[in-house]
Amino acid sequence: APIYKVLHDIVKVPGNKGIGLGFVATGYTYNTKYFKEKGWAAPSSWNELADPKYKKLLAISPITGTYGLHVLVMLARVNGGSETKIDPGFKAMEKVTPNILSFPPSPAKMSEALQSGDVAISIWGSGRSVALANTGFPVDFVYPKEGAVSLMIGVCPVAKPDASDLAQKFIQFNFRPEIQAVWAKEQGAGPANKNTKLEPDVAKLVPYGPEQVSKLVAVDWDVINKERENWTKRWQREVEK
């Protein structure tokens, strides 16, 4: 369909098995009021997770959640490792661990940790940050300079012999710029359609426009899925001990 020609490449799934309706980013969510009171600049690098000033002010999801996994992979990457060479990630976590107050296991618990003032900084999704900001709570989202990890809202028709043509049409409908704008405003999803126009207050909270979309990085899920069980056991021994 012609609509697929105006989508960002990052939403295209290899083998055309599905497509991303939009995307969110994993990066820093921080309490702007707290940072302002302290006179701190917004965080800008993954390695700042180890900054001693954040002692017991940091919340990170467990590795069983996607955001915690992204932390490990990105710390490996920015310290000379990768998904296939994860040791630098665990090594970097040794310096991060003293800063971690809690490992909230769900979005609700992460929101609670931030809203209670127990923590002032976390690694979280841009969409989650939008939802929290929409309540009036003073948070902002930062794309680390080395890249924020993209997380897609994927969609595909059910593969069956009598699949309705309407399923494809419904997916294509969702890529119309005006519908993409609704996804951005209500769900915090960065628009897949390059021609989508967003209101400034929405645009600043989602991955939007060539500059921000270019800051998104994808992780290698094929490698991660093979190693995840081992990494989880090691994380529980070394990080969440």
Predicted regions and their residues:
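Extracytoplasmic ligand-binding site segments that recognize negatively charged/polar headgroups
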Residues: 1-115
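A ligand-binding cleft/hinge motif common to bilobed small-molecule-binding domains
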Residues: 115, 120-138
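A bilobed periplasmic-binding-protein/Venus flytrap-type ligand-binding module shared by bacterial periplasmic
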Residues: 29-34, 74-78, 152-164, 182-183
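Periplasmic-binding protein-like
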Residues: 90-96, 103-104, 135-159
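Short, hydrophobic alpha-helical packing/hinge segments within bilobed ligand-binding/sensory domains
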Residues: 46, 110-111, 129, 167, ...
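Conserved C-terminal helix/tail region of periplasmic/extracytoplasmic solute-binding proteins
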Residues: 214-241
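Ligand-binding "clamshell"
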Residues: 9-16, 131-143
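Mature extracytoplasmic/periplasmic domains
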Residues: 158-216
